[in-house]
């Protein structure tokens, strides 16, 4: 059973850094629960505001529903007493409901609702999709604005009026006008989090649009650096942010951009580099090439 009401959860999440932990796999690319629990325990030993299990960085797109439920349950059992654990819900409406209900049964605190799978929908369809999931669980729900689920400000407002359990808006598009419209219309009714790849890159400007937090993938392998960066952002310390961007984040982006799909692969590469391997990535993603891993390891050494 969730420890926080949806509104309490929003208050906890909006003023701290959010982590999307990788999902550990063994040599056969099967879920390695023991290693995953160790990774989460390490992640939770730092002051992070929330952990999103089986999300994008956690290769949720490659997990079966049963695997996803197992990953979420393991996360809740391992660290749920100290940090809120949220789960992803995606695919068809029926699948998203199944994911949400399984997460609630496992003791998760909230849901990140991913776009419907490969289905184009107008605003009315998106409203019904989100409403169906919100109505099927008592957990707080965060909608993910990206791909084929671009929620207009009026749509978000209608959903917020209909469902008190809708607590957050995550943006993975980066359309500044769109974000400004949503924040201007909804204000403090929701909390807002950045969800672009390597979200640190955009964190300072998006803070001005109400996005007080973001999903940090690099927190997986450089947690203290990620927390320090977040604190610099919240302090509006442009000098410190720009230094960290130039010294680490932008060189990291250069490695990430060498191969499509490296946004996830490079996170597991980072764990390999610090001796905390979480295994490889599942196809169609590719593991980092040896030279890319060597370059990443050298970069991490500059901030460790």
Swiss-Prot record:
One of its GO terms (molecular function) is 5-dehydro-4-deoxyglucarate dehydratase activity. The keyword Lyase applies. InterPro entries: Aldolase_TIM (IPR013785), DapA-like (IPR002220), Dehydro-deoxyglucarate_dehyd (IPR017655). Pathway: Carbohydrate acid metabolism; D-glucarate degradation; 2,5-dioxopentanoate from D-glucarate: step 2/2. SUPFAM superfamilies: Aldolase (SSF51569). This is Probable 5-dehydro-4-deoxyglucarate dehydratase. Belongs to the DapA family. Keywords: Lyase. NCBIfam families: KdgD, PRK03620.1. It comes from the Bacteria. It is an enzyme of class 4 (lyase). It catalyses: 5-dehydro-4-deoxy-D-glucarate + H(+) = 2,5-dioxopentanoate + CO2 + H2O. One of its GO terms (biological process) is D-glucarate catabolic process. The keyword Lyase applies. Its EC number is 4.2.1.41.
């Amino acid at each position: 059973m969730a420890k926080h009401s949806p509104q309490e959860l929003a208050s906890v999440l909006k003023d701290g850094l959010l982590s999307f932990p990788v999902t550990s796999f063994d040599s056969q690319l099967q879920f390695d629960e023991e290693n995953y629990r160790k990774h989460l325990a390490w992640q939770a030993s730092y002051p992070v505001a929330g952990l999103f299990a089986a999300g994008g960085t956690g290769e949720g797109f490659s997990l079966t529903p049963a695997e996803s439920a197992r990953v979420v349950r393991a996360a809740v059992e391992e660290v749920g007493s100290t940090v809120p654990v949220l789960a992803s819900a995606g695919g068809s409406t029926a699948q998203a409901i199944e994911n949400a209900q399984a997460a609630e049964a496992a003791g998760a605190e909230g849901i990140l609702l991913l776009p419907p799978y490969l289905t184009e929908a107008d605003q009315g369809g998106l409203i019904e999709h989100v409403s169906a999931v919100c109505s099927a669980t008592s957990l707080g729900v965060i909608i993910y604005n990206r791909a084929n689920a671009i929620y207009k400000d009026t749509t978000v407002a209608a959903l917020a009026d209909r469902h008190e359990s809708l607590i957050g808006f995550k943006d993975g598009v980066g359309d500044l006008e769109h974000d400004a419209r949503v924040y201007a219309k909804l204000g403090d009714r929701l909390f807002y989090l950045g969800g672009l790849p390597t979200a640190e890159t955009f964190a300072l400007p998006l803070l001005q649009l109400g996005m007080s937090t973001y999903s940090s993938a690099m927190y997986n392998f450089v947690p203290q650096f990620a927390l320090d960066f977040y604190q610099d952002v919240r302090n509006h310390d442009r000098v410190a942010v720009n230094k960290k961007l130039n010294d680490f984040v932008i060189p990291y982006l250069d490695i990430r951009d060498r191969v499509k799909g490296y946004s996830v692969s490079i996170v597991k590469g980072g764990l390999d580099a610090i001796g905390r391997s979480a295994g490889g990535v599942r196809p169609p993603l590719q593991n980092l090439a040896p030279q890319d891993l060597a370059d990443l390891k050298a970069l991490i050494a500059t901030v460790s």
